[in-house]
From Swiss-Prot:
Record: glycosylation sites: 82, 146, 163, 169, 288, 440, 544
Known function: Promotes invasion of host epithelial cells by adhering to receptors on the host cell surface to facilitate endocytosis of the pathogen into host cells. Probably binds integrin ITGA3:ITGB1 via ITGB1, on the cell surface of host alveolar epithelial cells.
Gene disruption phenotype: RNAi-mediated knockdown decreases invasion of human alveolar epithelial cells.
Pfam family, one: CotH
Origin organism lineage: Eukaryota, Fungi, Fungi incertae sedis, Mucoromycota, Mucoromycotina
Organism: Rhizopus delemar (strain RA 99-880 / ATCC MYA-4621 / FGSC 9543 / NRRL 43880)
Database matches in PANTHER family: INNER SPORE COAT PROTEIN H
GO CC annotation, single: side of membrane
Underlying gene: CotH7
Region annotated Disordered, chain positions: 528-557
Protein's name according to its UniProt entry: Invasin CotH7
Length: 596
């Protein structure tokens, strides 16, 4: 019977073992990359010597464990196989694809934007793509150390959760290099060769996020805005490398003043033969008919100059905003419903470097194929959620009804709010947004879960010494966590403007809006003990320990306990799978004996 059992077990193992494809990114590898399965090492190979992306096959049962070994050093954790191929994994990152980050709800569905491409895996927030730029060493060094305005040809490789795409002869360079107050961690841009696209886009921009210790605000803003049914730019955090040198974590996004964004978000990759006029709004871009339109800078490919915006501005200025019919008629030449949604977001986040407060960092698109209809474009969401906010602390309590007086330059929104019907729509959007998404109960769980998922990459980013000239705040890894709940001061020469914690701002703004609009507080919480999300990495559970004060200290304690609990649970995962296997085998033996 013992020999029979042994034979049965061997048969079952043979039947259920499968050839598995392993895929791992290992930028630090110098000599070898291997996968370790029960002590058996299998060599993995890179198909392109420029890209540290290694693949290979080995036999393994579904649910069994494995780990990667680079230059003889093994990962300190076990991975569990799920399927016959791994996703594109990253050496020493325990979580490849997040499964515990809550999904933000879609709101304001009536009239929501449906024309754009937002489904490509490159924008999947549960995965951190890796971007590799390969160019001539002297040219790449020129960009990094001299921050030149030159652009160079380079090979760009995008690695998403499942696929890898490499495109040759891309044009690569810095975004607005050499400015006096630039940060040492630069912002980069590249264009793909004509006729080539990734995620239906041909132009990419990655922003350094250096003003924000958490590195979450800018993407969070865009994510919420799209959940509100707008055509806000797509965004995702990426790891970025130049000639295999790690440059850090960046926010990869659509640049809304480029036709790549218009093609993707307005036409789903199938633009009309004649595209419309596209503008970048600099300081003073208010759409003021009594002035000029010179603050709107046309894209170099725009078929119309800035004066083409004047007919819209004059038509808007001529509206009697006490007349509902005239206001409704605006929608024939301006999508003001989308504009109202963007203004709700500006108000909630104190987006001081945007349209309502400063009449800057906006833009416009004139759709010549749709009766020259004007679309407002929102961009650059880094100065939000209290970052660099030059206002008194109680500014967070300012109701939106005070904004037209406080910020008279925002002509479009201020005039629209003069109409009772439009004002009611704005207020409805504001109420719905606060009740369903912009509240501490929803964003607290979402933001902390995202931080925990990204923690190993944030720690890596904070360890990198930037080689470009510029401001260095010196935000620490610990501050990427602390600034979720409280203000922090940078240890570098520049102290930074992170006087508000991200969730601290959310909670304060939620409370203020609920009070001013007399909304119930059934879904509201404080930035304290109820904010907890399970940690997804050792760094999230062990390194996120700080001397937080008041409510933040409670949050820290709760989060770290959750992290510890999750860490223990993850360590017991192999035991769980082992028990499942034993149960499965015992049932299989029972069935086999019927036929022996």
């Amino acid at each position: 019977m013992k020999s029979l059992s042994f034979i049965s077990l061997a048969c079952l193992t043979a039947v259920h073992a499968a050839s598995v494809t392993f895929k791992v990114i290992a930028p630090t590898a110098e000599s070898s990359v291997q996968v370790n399965i029960n002590g058996q090492l299998t060599q993995l190979k890179a198909q392109d010597e420029d890209i540290p992306y290694y693949t290979g096959s080995a036999e393994l049962n579904d649910g069994q464990s494995y780990k990667y070994v680079v230059d003889g050093a093994a990962e300190t954790f076990e991975r569990i196989l799920n399927g016959t191929s791994t996703k594109n994994e990253f050496f020493n990152r325990p979580i490849t694809y997040a499964t515990n980050i809550p999904e933000l709800p879609n709101i304001l569905s009536e009239g929501s934007w449906t024309r754009g491409e937002t489904t490509d895996p490159l924008w999947d927030s549960n995965y951190v793509p890796s971007i590799f730029v390969t160019g001539k060493s002297d040219e790449m060094e020129d960009l990094i150390t001299n921050v030149t305005k030159k652009t160079y040809q380079a090979k760009i490789t995008f690695i998403g959760p499942e696929n890898i795409t490499t495109i040759e002869n891309c044009t690569f360079g810095l975004h607005k290099p050499g400015r006096k107050h630039n940060d040492a961690k630069q912002t980069w841009v590249w264009t793909l060769p004509e006729g080539q696209y990734v995620a239906k886009r041909s132009w990419f921009k990655i922003r350094h996020m250096e003003e924000d210790p958490t590195q979450l605000r800018e993407k969070l803003y865009a994510d919420i805005a799209r959940k509100m049914g707008t055509y806000a730019n797509e965004a995702n955090m990426v790891r970025f490398f130049i000639n295999k040198e790690g440059m850090g974590t960046f926010n990869m996004l659509d640049d809304v003043i480029m036709y790549s964004y218009i093609n993707a978000m307005f036409y789903n990759g199938n633009p009309p033969q004649q595209l419309g006029a596209l503008y970048d709004g600099a300081s003073g871009a208010a759409f003021n008919a009594s002035g000029d339109m010179d603050s709107f800078i046309p894209n170099v490919e725009s078929p119309l100059d800035q004066d083409a915006l004047m007919p819209f501005s004059k038509a808007f200025a001529a509206v009697d905003f006490s007349n509902d019919d005239q206001v409704k008629a605006i929608s024939q030449y301006f999508d003001y419903d989308q504009f109202l949604r963007f203004m709700v977001m500006e108000f909630l986040t104190a987006d001081w470097d945007g349209y309502w407060q400063e009449q800057t960092n906006d833009g416009a698109y004139i759709d010549v194929s749709d009766n020259n209809k004007v679309y407002y474009l929102a961009q650059d969401f880094d100065a939000t959620f209290g970052v660099n906010l030059d206002q008194e602390r109680d500014f967070v309590n300012t109701p939106y009804t005070d904004f037209p007086t406080k910020f008279p330059g925002g002509i479009l929104i201020n005039k629209l709010l003069e109409n009772p019907t439009t004002k009611a729509t704005f207020e409805t959007y504001l109420k719905t947004t606060v009740q369903e998404i912009f509240n501490n109960a929803t964003l607290g769980a979402y933001v902390t879960a995202r931080h925990n998922f990204l923690a190993p990459d944030l720690k890596w980013d904070r360890s990198i010494k930037q080689r470009s000239p510029g401001n260095i705040f010196g935000w620490t890894y610990e501050q990427t966590y602390q600034n979720l709940f409280e203000g922090v001061t940078a240890p570098g020469k520049e102290q930074g403007g992170a006087e508000w914690g991200l969730l601290e701002w959310v909670a304060a703004k939620e409370k203020a809006v609920r009070s001013s609009l007399k909304l119930s507080e059934t879904a509201t919480t404080s930035t304290s003990a109820t904010i907890a999300a399970p940690a997804t990495s050792e760094s999230a559970s062990q390194d996120n320990t700080s001397d937080d004060t008041d409510s933040a200290s409670t949050s820290s304690s709760t989060l770290n306990q959750a992290a510890a609990d999750t860490s223990s649970a993850s360590k017991s995962a192999p035991t769980f799978y082992c028990l499942q296997l034993v149960l499965y085998l015992s049932l299989s033996f029972k069935n086999l004996y019927k036929y022996i």
